[in-house]
């Protein structure tokens, strides 16, 4: 019932009741609909913990220039390194040298901006084509399996330190981010590979927690920050492979720890050592999942391979542009080569994830707010345990695919909508997709007292075309990635 009185604005006469009610009802419906839409939108943003970027001021520092087309590219482009080495499998087919379509102006500009953003001064870095010289331990005493200096579980610092604070904090870390214990000789040399783009705050939150933990563990380590410098969608697998190859140009490392920049360890009994039996998953328990294993096949966050293991599986896939699928594909590669999967116990393999407050409106489908949404769905449906909506199931992720239309971190860290189809061809393309097919160039190589910083450029078309077309993507999605058989180790 609409109890309204409408008056003519021109004649001053009363408008017909029917016309009045019709017009007022139409306006009321529009107002109600608009209000409802605003309410739903507000609730959705609240539930999913969407965040505005407080780092938007840095976004311009990392804004990439468009890649020139093949018709306009000049011969001043950077010549690609041949990524094929003598330690690759005998079945590997060497790739010819390629030209990466990266304008030198873009490379130089990106290089300067990154140094300013993450060190405040370019004087702290030096460019050295001869690489770093490692100084190893002179002690003949083997390091103990369980060092006495371990503190156990600790409360990590969530403060993002400055470059100068970190450099002063760790004077024993040598140029290039290398450290070796003085009182004993470690059993292996370890390369920490950190894939990176536009995550200064995360990097400088990770390092003040990671470095002292590695020191207490008597790890002989070198930290490599591998940054994607081209404006392609972020590809973590390519950075893993490039980091592996570039690290081997520094030293013949025994162990490679592939470490997400936002994963902060909180227990130093989680020893950063590789295992000759098989690859190790170091991070089963993360705070956003209440320190419980998210799903049985989880292989993301922090993982470790020996040099031979990573070579045997042909490294990581180069085809996953965007979020999702690359870690599960990496796990499958080990399974295909009959390597047993090892996982640290939940008593020690614990991590806190740095809050993702990035530029753009992207939603992390595994955020706390997202899990609250799944909980509400499950309660509302009143279904049995076997019918619950899994946070990693296919249809909820489509919701995030549609929401994540804006680029994350100003660089395109979006959900990959084809990740399950790419995953379906994992076994068939493993021998042709990886370190033996990687085409990339080193846009810069810089060392500092904290890390070795390597800029990596690549072209998506060149990367994709290096794989046979029938092996790049399958016709149907494969959702079997949720399962995995692991042996728990301490």
Curated annotation (Swiss-Prot):
InterPro entries: Galactosyl_T, Galactosyl_T_C, Galactosyl_T_N, Nucleotide-diphossugar_trans. GO terms for biological process: carbohydrate metabolic process; protein glycosylation. It is a single-pass type II membrane protein. Pathway: Protein modification; protein glycosylation. Signal peptide: none annotated. It is found in: Golgi apparatus membrane. Keywords: Glycoprotein, Glycosyltransferase, Golgi apparatus, Membrane, Signal-anchor, Transferase, Transmembrane, Transmembrane helix. The keyword Transmembrane helix applies. PANTHER family: BETA-1,4-GALACTOSYLTRANSFERASE, BETA-1,4-N-ACETYLGALACTOSAMINYLTRANSFERASE. Belongs to the glycosyltransferase 7 family. This is Beta-N-acetyl-D-glucosaminide beta-1,4-N-acetylglucosaminyl-transferase. The lineage of its organism: Eukaryota, Metazoa, Spiralia, Lophotrochozoa, Mollusca.
């Amino acid at each position: 019932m609409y109890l309204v009185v409408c008056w003519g604005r021109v004649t001053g006469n009363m408008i017909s009741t029917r016309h009045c009610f019709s017009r007022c009802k139409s306006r009321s419906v529009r107002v109600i609909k608009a209000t409802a839409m605003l309410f739903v939108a507000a609730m959705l943003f609240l539930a999913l913990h969407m965040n505005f970027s407080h780092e938007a001021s840095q976004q311009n520092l990392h804004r990439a220039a468009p890649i020139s087309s093949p018709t306009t590219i000049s011969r001043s482009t950077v010549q690609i390194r041949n990524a094929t080495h003598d330690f690759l499998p005998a079945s590997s087919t060497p790739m010819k040298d390629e030209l990466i379509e990266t304008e030198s102006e873009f490379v130089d500009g990106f290089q300067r901006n990154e140094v300013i953003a993450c060190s405040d001064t370019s004087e702290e870095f030096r460019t050295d084509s001869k690489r770093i010289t490692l100084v190893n331990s002179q002690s003949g005493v083997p390091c103990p399996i369980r060092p006495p200096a371990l503190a156990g579980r600790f409360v990590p610092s969530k403060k993002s330190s400055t470059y100068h604070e970190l450099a002063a904090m760790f004077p024993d870390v040598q140029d290039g981010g290398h450290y070796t214990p003085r009182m004993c000789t470690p059993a292996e040399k370890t390369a920490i590979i950190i894939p990176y783009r536009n995550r200064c705050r995360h990097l400088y939150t990770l390092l003040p927690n990671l470095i002292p933990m590695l020191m207490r563990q008597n790890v002989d380590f070198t930290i490599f920050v591998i940054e994607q410098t081209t404006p392609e969608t972020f590809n973590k697998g390519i950075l893993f492979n490039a980091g592996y190859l570039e690290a081997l140009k520094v030293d013949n490392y025994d162990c490679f720890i592939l470490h997400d920049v936002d994963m902060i360890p909180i227990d130093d009994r989680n020893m950063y050592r590789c295992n000759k039996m098989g690859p190790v998953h170091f991070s089963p328990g993360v705070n956003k999942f209440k320190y419980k294993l998210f799903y049985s096949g989880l292989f993301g966050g922090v993982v470790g391979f020996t040099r031979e293991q990573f070579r045997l599986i042909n490294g990581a896939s180069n085809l996953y542009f965007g979020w999702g699928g690359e870690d599960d594909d990496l796990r499958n590669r080990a399974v295909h080569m009959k390597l047993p999967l090892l996982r640290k116990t939940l008593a020690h393999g614990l991590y806190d994830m740095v809050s993702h407050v990035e530029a753009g409106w992207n939603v992390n489908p595994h955020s706390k707010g997202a899990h609250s949404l799944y909980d509400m769905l499950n309660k509302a449906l009143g279904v049995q345990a076997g019918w619950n909506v899994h946070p990693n199931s296919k249809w909820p992720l489509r919701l995030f695919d549609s929401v994540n239309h804006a680029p994350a971190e100003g660089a395109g860290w979006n959900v990959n909508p084809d990740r399950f189809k790419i995953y379906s061809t994992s076994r068939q393309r493993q021998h042709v997709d990886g370190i033996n097919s990687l085409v990339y160039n080193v846009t810069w190589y810089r060392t500092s007292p904290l890390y070795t910083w390597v800029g990596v450029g690549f072209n998506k078309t060149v990367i994709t075309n290096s794989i046979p077309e029938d092996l790049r993507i399958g016709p149907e999605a494969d959702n079997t990635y949720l399962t995995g058989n692991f042996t728990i180790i301490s």
